[in-house]
């Protein structure tokens, strides 16, 4: 991410996280005049474990990526309320920020505009697709499908969704290959 945005790399041994998930609970704002962030950021995986976080925050020009030290004054880890099943053992909760010093990373909107963002999103979509295929497998193997019209209809819906998703992922992969 830092290389995509023409920023200096973090020091060797620095453990970093990217907290860019948004939702109604996300109230984090960057104040350009003071160079600080304030508000809440949900779904911060690795909170309490990492040294540095790259965090998306709202600002006057939309959204902006900032870099901050996670042990800075004003950083408060909320009790974990969300348990990321795929990352058991990694704390993932809301972090509250109160006028925490933050350095802008790139221009406003640059995090979402960089090519690597869409490449990463495609990888996540492929993972979700793989999970959907695995979830559909028992239905596809079920002997009920032969004798149960409703089960056969549901399997047809599942197959259509999986096939259209696969087609979109192939199209996305071709676009990424053409636009690295």
Question: What kind of region is each of these model predictions?
Answer:
Residues 1-49:
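Glycine-rich flavin
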Residues 1-5, 133-141, 174:
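Short glycine/serine- and small hydrophobic-enriched flexible loop segments
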Residues 14, 24, 49-51, 62, ...:
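A generic structural signal for well-ordered coil/turn residues at beta-strand boundaries
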Residues 18-20, 38, 55-56, 67-71, ...:
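Short beta-strand segments
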Residues 34-38, 77, 95-99:
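Generic recognition of long tandem-repeat/solenoid scaffolds
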Residues 43-77:
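A short core secondary-structure module
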Residues 84-166:
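Glycine-rich beta->alpha junctions and the first turn(s) of the following alpha-helix
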Residues 166-180:
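C-terminal helix-coil-helix/basic helical segment that borders enzyme active sites and/or dimer interfaces
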């Amino acid at each position: 991410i830092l290389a995509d945005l023409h920023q200096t790399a973090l020091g060797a041994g620095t453990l970093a996280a990217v907290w860019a998930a948004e939702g109604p609970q996300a109230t984090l704002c960057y104040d350009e005049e003071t160079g600080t962030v304030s508000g809440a950021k949900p779904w911060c995986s690795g909170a309490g474990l990492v040294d540095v976080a790259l965090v998306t925050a709202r600002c006057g020009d939309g959204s902006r990526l900032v870099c901050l030290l996670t042990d800075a004054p004003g950083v408060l880890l909320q009790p974990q309320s969300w348990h990321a099943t795929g990352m058991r053992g990694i704390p993932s909760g809301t972090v509250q920020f109160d006028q925490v010093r933050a350095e802008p990373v790139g221009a406003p909107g640059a995090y979402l505009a960089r090519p690597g963002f869409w490449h990463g999103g495609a990888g996540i979509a492929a993972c979700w697709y793989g999970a959907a295929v695995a979830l559909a497998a028992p239905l596809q193997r079920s002997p009920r499908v032969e004798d149960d019209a409703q089960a056969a209809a549901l399997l047809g819906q599942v197959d259509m969704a999986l096939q259209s998703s696969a087609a979109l992922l192939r199209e996305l992969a071709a676009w990424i290959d053409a636009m690295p």
